[in-house]
Amino acid sequence: MDQLAHHYRAHIAELNRRVAEILSREALSGLVIHSGQPHRMFLDDINYPFKANPHFKAWLPVLDNPNCWLVVNGRDKPQLIFYRPVDFWHKVSDVPDMFWTEHFDIKLLTKADKVAELLPKDTVNWAYLGEHLDVAEVLGFTSRNPDAVMSYLHYHRTTKTEYELECMRRANQIAVQGHLAAKNAFYNGASEFEIQQHYLSAVGQSENEVPYGNIIALNQNAAILHYTALEHQSPAKRLSFLIDAGASYFGYASDITRTYAFEKNRFDELIAAMNKAQLELIDMMRPGVRYPDLHLATHAKVAQMLLDFDLATGDAQGLVDQGITSAFFPHGLGHMLGLQVHDVGGFSHDERGTHIAAPEAHPFLRCTRILAPNQVLTMEPGLYIIDTLLNELKQDSRGLQINWQTVDELRPFGGIRIEDNVIVHQDRNENMTRELGLAD
């Protein structure tokens, strides 16, 4: 923790610098950042799992306590208003006592509706950052999530501090242990539900603590891109396993995917080809490279795989130009990663929030930025047998280029995705996922 504490001091200094700069530009006195409030289920007395405002947890790892507030102006010591009610029904969060607390002036709040007593007296020139605009209005904030402030912060969130990079390494290290446990469970005959339990146990996090709903897909379920159901029964014949699962550390996410074949066969060879292609794409990452160019390079590699594995005929560029590769690889190559799994800033050209749209032919690409040092991105090429997309090819002449017999043979395996989390450095790439123990 000493290393993290050392990096944290510089992290807070950088956040204060960013705040001071945008406040000066926008002639604001400061920012009031709300952690959030509980959300009650409809017609019930149970709350949905609480998720803290990412702008709040960028400053400190208070992740599970609603009704907290940060008051920052880039000059003075940030003020943390920490919610600690008198409550005999629920566990009350302990007063923080960690390496980061020395950087905050901490005040305790016992009643959520009394927060105005601890906030700046005149909020007219302060900006509220958070979800609950009705609360902000009652408290007198006329500036609520102002575009100029949000665009500036989102643009700079893509450049990670050393503290953030270390948190993300630890999130990867934790997730790798879960992936290894899940892989072992798959080869030992576990069901999707059982594999999920092995994963969560290995990472030591609950379903509400991991950064997103795990994808644990056996056989043809791997063709469903965001498959989050969990079958309790093992399939009669075990063919393949796709796992897309991450872990959290101090609010930062990892997002890792692997695909396995149960036996050595043609599908296993296709996984090996995808693994090779993914590593080649990662080698292409460097400052100054346009992320959409990496996405287009992925389609070229997918096209070659379609030809090599007798899934399609023709020439590779023609398969891309006709949209045939998009039927087999319909999603983007990856996205920014950080406080959120699909982190903000992926389309921002500048601090003003100028939007760089995804290419028209690739609308699901989540990042159009030019790569720069200390950015963290996922790299997740895939190839799937998705009938709804392939049926579109059958409706025109493109269907004549598809070897439907090979498609039928691979359909029971679902699909392949391989995903690593990569830091772009000035002179190298740091593949956190592989370097921390998940070689394949």
UniProtKB/Swiss-Prot annotation:
Species the sequence originates in: Shewanella sp. (strain W3-18-1)
Binding-site positions, Mn(2+) 2: D244, D255, E419
Superkingdom of origin: Bacteria
Matches recorded under HAMAP family: X_Pro_dipeptid
Enzyme Commission numbers on file: 3.4.13.9
Any one Gene Ontology BP term: proteolysis
Family: Belongs to the peptidase M24B family. Bacterial-type prolidase subfamily.
Keyword hit for Metal-binding: yes
Cofactor annotation remark: Binds 2 manganese ions per subunit.
Protein name as catalogued: Xaa-Pro dipeptidase
SUPFAM superfamilies for this protein: Creatinase/aminopeptidase, Creatinase/prolidase N-terminal domain
Record-level Gene Ontology MF annotations: aminopeptidase activity; metal ion binding; metalloexopeptidase activity; phosphoric triester hydrolase activity; proline dipeptidase activity
Statement: the UniProt record of this protein carries the keyword Metal-binding: yes
Keywords: Dipeptidase, Hydrolase, Manganese, Metal-binding, Metalloprotease, Protease
Residues annotated as binding Mn(2+) 1: D255, H335, E380, E419
